[in-house]
Amino acid sequence: MIHRGLWLHNLVQSYRVGSSSSSSTLFKLVYRYNSSTSLAKSSLKQSCELSCKSNTEPSNMDWDKLGFKLMPTDYVYSMKCSNEGNFEQGRLELHGNIELSPAAAVLNYGQGIFEGTKAYRKEDGSLLLFRPDQNGVRMRIGAERMCMPSPSVDQFVDAVKQTAIANRRWVPPSGKGSLYIRPLLMGTGAVLGVAPAPQYTFLAYASPVGNYFKEGLAPLRLYVEDEFDRASPGGTGFVKTIGNYSRCLAALSRAKNKGFSDVLFLDSVHKKYVEELSSCNIFIVQGNQISTPAANGTILSGVTRSSIIEIARDHGFKVEERKIAVDELMEAEEVFCTGTAVGVASVGSITYHNKRVEFKTGSQSVSQKFYSTLIGIQTGVVEDKKGWIVEID
């Protein structure tokens, strides 16, 4: 192996002799060499830190008081996309801020999508993922809609696995919560006019979380929004683009200021049909029939949503995906919400046009039955007969 100093000396001498070579080219080559050397050292350092940290529980951590707030962990997974549209080998980096051009497409034109999945700890300490491949498929669908290249499903799942393993000490004990993993795909290349970015970055970071809503497992209080809408036909409501969530903030803030847990949006055309909440899907129960709004292009086809549809049918319920008028919603026996962040959450009341209606909740409710089955599968307590669980350790 050539000594680093001798290699640089020979490189400089060769460029001094060659008159056709520019100093900028020399700088780029030396910079690349220094960068690759630093990268190797950094990777070695991170590997050492990873092996030391991975099994050491964070100090002063009260797992019983976890909410749904960002708690930075140790590592972030990063993967760059070349100009040819191929994603390079990803790597783990220490958690920290990232640098972006002020002209990055994600900042100027919102060219970005994200996913959400969770890692759970079994009683024996091993880690489980719940259907991460479905999140990978959905990211690819979203990327196509947003004119972005996307990692393959295998690359996506591998990134989630690596993120979970690297941050395993932050996975709460069984029954205390989960490690929420946020994969993010964004146009990081600089553009001035409206156009797809020239470069893209995939990231995955993690945070230990408990219940999404401040109510914990208590029934939710929802407010039906009939002024603002979340999505419109032909738009991006069916993908997890970042703009879908920022447009919910005004309505959500208004509802929370009135003491509600979340806001329920109606369709943008008729202002009559139920769509979804700011962060999750909705179901209604009437006897042995369960209904949820059809995924027709304006709502997100949630991974938890599709799982609950299967679980409900396994429990003998008839499940329909169809249009649900808000008047029918208000006459339901039971209402509940589903999502990766929220799990399965029962709805205690809904307010629409100053009319408040209460719904069945409690240990005998349908939603509680589904919640117990779902969380049981996710944590390894209930047998997974569907191949949904990926055990990674």
From Swiss-Prot:
Transit peptide stretch: 1-34
- EC no. given is 2.6.1.42
Major site of localization recorded for this protein: mitochondrion
SUPFAM superfamilies noted in UniProt: D-aminoacid aminotransferase-like PLP-dependent enzymes
The name this protein carries in UniProt is: Branched-chain amino acid aminotransferase 1, mitochondrial
**Entry keyword annotation includes Transport:** no
Q: Where found?
A: Mitochondrion
UniProt cofactor(s): pyridoxal 5'-phosphate
Q: Give residues annotated as binding pyridoxal 5'-phosphate.
A: 138, 276
Q: What else is known?
A: Branched-chain amino acids are synthesized in chloroplasts, whereas the degradation takes place in mitochondria.
- Pathway, per UniProt? Amino-acid biosynthesis; L-isoleucine biosynthesis; L-isoleucine from 2-oxobutanoate: step 4/4; Amino-acid biosynthesis; L-leucine biosynthesis; L-leucine from 3-methyl-2-oxobutanoate: step 4/4; Amino-acid biosynthesis; L-valine biosynthesis; L-valine from pyruvate: step 4/4
Any idea which residues bear N6-(pyridoxal phosphate)lysine here? 240
In the record, biological process GO terms are: isoleucine biosynthetic process; L-leucine biosynthetic process; L-valine biosynthetic process
Active site located where? 240 (proton acceptor)
> Where, by tissue, is this protein expressed?
Expressed specifically in lupulin glands.
Q: Which GO terms describe its cellular component?
A: mitochondrion
- Tell me the keywords, alphabetical order: Amino-acid biosynthesis, Aminotransferase, Branched-chain amino acid biosynthesis, Mitochondrion, Pyridoxal phosphate, Transferase, Transit peptide
